[in-house]
């Protein structure tokens, strides 16, 4: 497997196809995750999204904040995203490694959504502390993963991606307990409600954990 699956194999048009699903339940998951963040925005926030892909979530949230910056490791994603976001003047997508963040400014809201802790292969507790360093006083970080109640729909969605040739064939002997493994080496883990609570507690920051739509689990960390 290549070092970064999303940068090398699942980017731009291929990543766009991931979200063109035939499953209404999966579409509701996409919408509910965004809606949870949106209800915390008042229109004045400076927002950063980590692992933003081609800007799918950015486009939905841009009307609800002052401006939104997204970073992604893939130049192809950013090139595709510039066209995707062409009519969104307060959104900017840039190439940056989420493990080597280079910002002089801080943000009111930092997002790490769509199971980003797994996709970016982070050490969750260490990365939460890095994220909080990007937040202005009074700001929040939103980190999401999958609810255990969404497992069957999530698995069907990943089978759909494999059938489209976007992922390798799913290895059903190894796929279990919130972890999806493909025969091409791709692996997607999960942070459960219990995991998120443990991370939040160990971080030392004010936090809450919420299940949304029985599809997402959110860790919301506040910087005072």
Please tell me what each predicted stretch does.
Residues 51-53:
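Class I SAM-dependent methyltransferase "Motif I" SAM/SAH-binding loop
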Residues 56-100:
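Class I SAM-dependent methyltransferase SAM/SAH-binding core
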């Amino acid at each position: 497997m290549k070092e970064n699956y999303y940068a090398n194999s699942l980017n731009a048009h291929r990543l766009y196809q991931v979200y063109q699903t035939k499953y209404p339940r999966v579409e509701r998951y996409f919408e509910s995750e965004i809606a949870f963040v949106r209800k915390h925005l008042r229109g004045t926030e400076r927002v950063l999204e980590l692992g933003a892909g081609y800007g799918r979530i950015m486009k939905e949230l841009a009307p609800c904040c002052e401006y939104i910056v997204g970073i992604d490791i893939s130049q192809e994603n950013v090139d595709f995203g510039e066209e995707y976001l062409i009519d969104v003047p307060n959104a900017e997508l840039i190439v940056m490694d989420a493990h080597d963040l280079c910002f002089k400014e801080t943000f009111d809201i930092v997002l790490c959504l769509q199971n980003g802790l797994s996709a970016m292969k982070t050490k969750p507790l260490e990365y939460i502390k890095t994220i909080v360093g990007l937040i202005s006083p009074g700001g929040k970080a939103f980190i999401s993963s999958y609810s255990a109640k969404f497992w069957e729909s999530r698995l069907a969605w990943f089978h759909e991606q494999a059938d489209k040739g976007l992922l390798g064939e799913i290895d059903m002997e190894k796929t279990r307990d919130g972890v999806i493994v493909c025969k091409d080496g791709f692996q997607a883990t999960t942070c459960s409600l219990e995991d998120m609570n443990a991370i939040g507690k160990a971080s030392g920051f004010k936090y809450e954990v919420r299940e949304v739509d029985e599809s997402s689990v959110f860790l919301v960390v506040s910087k005072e």
